[in-house]
Each structure stands twice: as C-alpha cells, then as structure tokens.
C-alpha cells in the first residue's frame, strides 16, 4: 500500500515512497530564543510521521535545519553583549532539551546554515547566470521575481497582490517584491567572502542549498508551518526551480496549521507564547501529544490550560484501558478481532495524509471494546494478549508512554509512579517528602491536599513516596 500526502501546491494527494525511500526536509528553528509550544507542533508531528514510515519498512532520510545566522540572532547578541555564536550555542542546546522532554527524536541530519555558505554562493551564481538574480552596487544580490512565471503558485497569490515582506531600503531593487539572496556586510556583523564582497546569506537561499546538499534527488516531502508558506517556501521554490529547472525539488509540500491562544496565532512578536519546557512540565508529555495529534496537522489548533487538562484526562483514560489488559497472556476471538480492526484502521488513517485523529480514534474504539467486555466479565482482562500487543506497538509509535512503573529522582527524593507524571507535580511531591523528613507536618499535609485536589494521590512507604492518579 502507498502513502499519500496532501500537497499544498497542487491541492491533491501525492503518493510518496514508491521506490521504498522517502526524503523529508522540514524547516527548523532560528535559534535566538527558547522555542514555544507552537514551534513544537511541526517537530512532534514529523517525528510521528517518520516513526510510522519506518515501521512500514520505508527507508527515510529525515532532515531539519538550524538557521544559525539571522538578523534576530545578531540583534539578540548585541542586546546581551555576547557573540552571535554564544546565542546560537545557547538556544540550540535549549531547543534540543525541549525536544528531549517531549520525547521527540532527532533527524538523520541537522545541517546548519553557516556550514553551507559555499553551496549557497554556488546556487546564487547559477541564478545570476540564468538571469534570475542580479547583484546590486552595494554588494547585495537579489532574486528577480518577474523572471519566474510560477511565482505565487504555492501561496495562491498573484504578484500584484503580494505583501512586501522585506524591511529596509529597496532602492537597489528592480521590483519591490525582489528578495535578498546575499546581504552585504555591515560593520561589526559576521560575514563571509563572496564574489560580491563580504556578506551573509539571505534566509531563503539557506534552505534551498541545504535541500540540494542533503537530498540531491529532491525532497519527497517538504514540511513547515503555514505561516512560512509565503514568503519563505514560495521563495525556496523560485530559487531551486530557477537554478535547476530540469531537476526535481519537492514532490509534496505539507504545511502544518498554527497554534492559537485566545483565537490569536501564538507568536513571540505578539507576546502570547508559552515556553515548550514550561508547558511540558506543567501538563506532561503525553497530554501534549494527545492535544496535537487529535487534530489533523494541517488545521489550526487552540491552546489553553483547560484544553490541555481535558487532553490529559483523555490520554489517561486510554492508557488506563491499556493497563487493564497489559498482563494478558491469552487471546480471545474478541481480542483478535479488535486487534485486527485496530491495525487496519490505524494503517489506513496514517497512509492517507498522516491522519492522526482517525488513528487515535481507532485506538480509543479498540480499547473501549475491551473495556466493555471486562466490565461485564472481569475475568476477561486476561484474554486480550493480541490487542495488548497492538495497542502497545501503536501507542509507542505515536510516542505515548506505555511503560509500567517508573522511578524519578528529584532533588534527592526517589519517587515511584506509573507512567508519566508532569515535572512540576514531581517537584511538589519531592518538596512534601522533604517537609516530612523535617517533621513539618502542616506543610506536608498542605501539599498532599493540593495534589489530591488536582487528582494525584501519594502513598508514603519506607522506600519513598509512590505517586498515582486517583
């Protein structure tokens, strides 16, 4: 069976991986700040998509980039009085830490823009040779959009309707819509030598060069947020197809919807962001996965504490049903039927544009089927081995925590708990245990009651506290 992706350019479903191989390129972060929970959406979704493809035998090469030179990075460095390289190091580490908290795997290749300056210069030279780009007297180089007749096809805009996105002087441009391929250096800014003088690359040329370097046959899927469909992806398309008109660039463009807060796009420029680390520690990894995966990746999604709490309860319900049958060693005909239907529905959903909401619905339906049987006949709990195996495999594929008892150590306190527990909950359990050791009983009781109100029970044992869901 094939895997199909809804292509933003054509609007149709495009089959990928016909030869058993899939190359995926996703635009990564510009590392000048901590990533927020809206930034996480694309990385978490593509982590799941790649897991699914590999589970079905596809050989996947997965690439996302790090934009490590940009005006925002330079401005942040100047504000803090440190080098731009220190800003890049700090926020790349921060990005990786937040991915680990969410259980998001790393790509096969994570190229950095500054490691590909020669490839960018070669690409710009080819665009100039073909008449798609021109150097300006001040050392800048611009792409001439009027030389590319398909400009606007990806974003479904006519050039005369487009908003000019580049700030600053346009006196050297032939057309206000022309965009920068190479920026002449300014005093004190990082720069690299080029045929047009010292400078640095524009944002859009970076991804074109890195796709060409790491996926030389073109990307089967190019992912990114719907907010960069224009101008970034539109400009990538113009650059790569302008330089290599006879070479495939992207077979399917896949854009994920924006995360909204109070009906407004979550963005640093708006000031309504929630740090991905803060959200993960507060709500837990599984709740965030359930929240993001129960909506189709292409649709916008709303964030609030209330929504995340609802998703946490939903996830806990599913995992509780799984744990009810987790000790099964025999398989009844009902178990085999539910397992077979689950695998079939899950596979069909994921092969049709990675439909995670339908895949999760299949998980709930199968688990609920087992739950109804156990409610009417408790002894049936040991007869669902085949369904247990299917649930374990598919929940794990989506990145949910299906482990049994865990032990977390927080500030010297060992805490046992079933499955995942949010970091801030574990911190309060540790505070309570330290209060008990100091015989500060009112504080220990206060923390216990606070956690009880939030649905967490604590059992005090000689080996330390045991945390569980009520």
From Swiss-Prot:
**One Pfam family in the UniProt entry:** DALR_2
Q: A GO molecular function for this record?
A: cysteine-tRNA ligase activity
Q: Which InterPro entries match?
A: Cys-tRNA-ligase, Cys-tRNA-synt_Ia_DALR, Cys-tRNA/MSH_ligase, Rossmann-like_a/b/a_fold, tRNA-synt_1_cat_dom, tRNAsynth_Ia_anticodon-bd
Reactions mediated catalytically: tRNA(Cys) + L-cysteine + ATP = L-cysteinyl-tRNA(Cys) + AMP + diphosphate
Q: Where does Zn(2+) bind?
A: 27, 207, 232, 236
Question: Source organism lineage?
Answer: Bacteria, Bacillati, Actinomycetota, Rubrobacteria, Rubrobacterales
Q: How is the cofactor bound?
A: Binds 1 zinc ion per subunit.
Designated name of the protein: Cysteine--tRNA ligase
Q: Name one GO cellular component term.
A: cytosol
Protein family per UniProt: Belongs to the class-I aminoacyl-tRNA synthetase family.
EC number(s) per entry: 6.1.1.16
Q: Please give the subunit comment from the record.
A: Monomer.
Q: Which cofactor does it need?
A: Zn(2+)
Which cysteine pairs make disulfide bonds? none
Q: Where in the cell is it found?
A: Cytoplasm
User: Where in this protein would one find the motif 'KMSKS' region, according to its record?
Assistant: 265-269
User: Which of this chain's residues are annotated to bind ATP?
Assistant: 268
Q: Which PANTHER family match?
A: CYSTEINE--TRNA LIGASE, CYTOPLASMIC, CYSTEINYL-TRNA SYNTHETASE
Query: Coding gene?
Result: cysS
Motif 'HIGH' region per UniProt: ranges: 29-39
Q: Which keywords are on file for this protein?
A: Aminoacyl-tRNA synthetase, ATP-binding, Cytoplasm, Ligase, Metal-binding, Nucleotide-binding, Protein biosynthesis, Zinc
